[in-house]
Amino acid sequence: MAPKKNKAAKKSKADINEMTIMVEDSPSNKINGLNTLLEGGNGFSCISTEVTDPVYAPNLLEGLGHMRQDSFLCDLTVATKSKSFDVHKVVMASCSEYIQNMLRKDPSLKKIELSDLSPVGLATVITYAYSGKLTLSLYTIGSTISAALLLQIHTLVKMCSDFLMRETSVENCMYVVNIADTYNLKETKEAAQKFMRENFIEFSEMEQFLKLTYEQINEFLTDDSLQLPSELTAFQIAVKWLDFDEKRLKYAPDLLSNIRFGTITPQDLVSHVQNVPRMMQDAECHRLLVDAMNYHLLPFQQNILQSRRTKVRGGLRVLLTVGGRPALTEKSLSKDILYRDEDNVWNKLTEMPAKSFNQCVAVLDGFLYVAGGEDQNDARNQAKHAVSNFSRYDPRFNTWIHLANMIQKRTHFSLNTFNGLLFAVGGRNSDGCQASVECYVPSSNQWQMKAPMEVPRCCHASSVIDGKILVSGGYINNAYSRAVCSYDPSTDSWQDKNSLSSPRGWHCSVTVGDRAYVLGGSQLGGRGERVDVLPVECYNPHSGQWSYVAPLLTGVSTAGAATLNNKIYLLGGWNEIEKKYKKCIQVYNPDLNEWTEDDELPEATVGISCCVVTIPTRKTRESRASSVSSAPVSI
C-alpha cells in the first residue's frame, strides 16, 4: 500500500496577505535601503535642485502657433474691418490686458471687433503673442504701435520704442519725433530730439529740415542745450529756413529773437550778420543787431545788460583753479587757469594777464574776477609784494579786460559777491594788516570804500549767508583768532557773531544751502608750532550757532574751495604734518556729512583759488580757436 502523501498545511488568508504584502513591498524596501546610505554616517548629503528644459517654452509657443495656423482648438476671433484672425483666448489674454479684461467680463465671448486697427498691425501683434518675435520696419511700425497700445501690450510698446531710438539717424530723426509725438511715446521723443540737438548741423543740411514748422524750429532755437560750434551758425541756420519760403518772412523777428547775438563776436556781427538784408531792413531785426553791438561797445555795462541772448548755449559748469604756487616750480608763480571736464580730466582754459599767488577770485554774471594777491614769491615778506590788480575774464570769448585797480593793495584778504557788487575785505600789504573794506560797482568800473571792520584782520575767510558777509577767524593782533563778524551791505555796518570753536587762519569758507562752512587752515599747537585744523564747523544763521560736522581727511591751509552740485570741493594746500604741498581734492557731501577723496590736481599747489564758472562746450571753444576773428584779445 502506497504511503500517504502529506497534505500541505493550509495557509490562512492572513498568511497569504502577508506574503503578498512582502512581495509588493520589495522595491520599496530597496529604496529604503538606499535611503539609509544618505542617512548613515558613511552616506552623502543630497539637496533638491530645480532643472529647466530650455527648449520647452519655445516649443510650447511653436506648438501653439501651429495650432493657430491649423485653427485647432481656437476659441476666439479678433477682427479688423477687413480681416479676421482665429486665436486662442488663453494666449491672447496672457499678453493683452485689453483682451483679458474683456474675457473676465464675459468668458464666453467668441469675437472681438477691433475696427480701429489695421490688419498689418493686428497680425504683427498676434505673431508677437505666439512667438515673442516680430519684424519691425519704420514703414509699418506705426500700425504696430497703434495695435500694441490699444491691446495694452506694454512689452511690445517698449520693444517698438527701443527700436525707434536704436534706428534714429539724421535722415529719419524728424519722422521718429513725429511718430513718437503721435503715439505719446515721451521717452522716444525726448531721445530723438536729443539726437537732433546733438547733430543739428547735419540735420540742417537734410531736406527734412526745410519742412520743419515754425513751432518746431522755434523750439530748437530756444533750446539752451542745442549743440552748435557757434551762435553765428545758429543764425545762419535760421536764415536758411526763413529764405526757403517767402511766406516765412513774417516769422523773422520772433525766430531771430532766439539767436544769442550777444555771444557772437563784434567782427562776426559786422562780417556775417549785418550784411544780411533783413537785419538792416526789418526794424525789429535791426534792433537785435544794434543791441548786440551796444553790448560789445560797453564792456563795463555788460553785467546789467546780461540776458538770455548773452548767455552761451549749452554751457558747461566746471570747477576752476586759478594761479597759485606749484610744488615743482616752487620759486615761480603760476598764470594758469585750469578746468576739470566731464571726464574729471584737468585742462588748461587760459592764462591770467600776470602771475599771481594768494589772489582772490569771484564769479558774477558769468564773468570771472581776479583780484589782488602777490606778484612775487617771497615767503619772508609776502605783504611787501601785495598788489591791487583787478581783472575780468569772459569765458564766452576767452578774453580778459583790465578793470580799475582796488583802492588798496591786498593779499590774504577775502572777496565776495552780493547783489551785483563785489566786496574786498581786510587782508594785508606793506602797511600791515588791514581793516578796510571796499566795494566794486561793475556798471561804473569803480571801487568805493565801505565801513571798516572793528579790528584789522588778514588770513581770514568769508562767505555770504542770509544776505550778509560772514567773516571768520584769521590773524588778528599777531595771533590766530576765533572771532567772527558779519557785514550787512544794506546798512553798511558790522556786527560781532558767535566765535568759532577753534582758532584758525589761512582757511576757507563756503556756503551750501542755508549753512556756511569753515574748513581747513592752521593754528598754533601746544609748543607754539603751526598745526593743521582738521575739524570743520558749520554756521546756522537762524540760531547764530556753530556746530561740528565731519572733519577733514587731510589737513590743509592756503587751499582753494568751491561748491559744485551742492558739494564742497577743497583743493590743494599746505599740510603741516608732512611739511609739503598737496595735490589732493577732498569732497564734502552735506547730505551724508561725509568727506571723500577725489581725483588729484595735476600738480601739488598752494595759494590756489577756486570757483565754478560756465564755459562754452569744447566744440564751441575749438571753433573759436580756429577762427582769427575770435582769437583772445585784451582790452
UniProtKB/Swiss-Prot annotation:
Domain of life, per lineage: Eukaryota
Transferase is among the record's keywords: no
BACK domain mapped to chain residues: 173-274
The protein's name: Kelch-like protein 31
Kelch repeats: 318-366, 367-420, 421-467, 469-514, 516-566, 567-615
CC terms in the record's Gene Ontology section: cytoplasm; nucleus
Residues covered by the BTB domain: 74-138
UniProt KW keywords: Kelch repeat, Repeat
Tissue occurrence: Strongly expressed in fast skeletal muscle, and weakly in heart. Not expressed in other tissues.
PANTHER family assigned to the protein according to its UniProt record, in alphabetical order: KELCH-LIKE PROTEIN 31, LD33804P
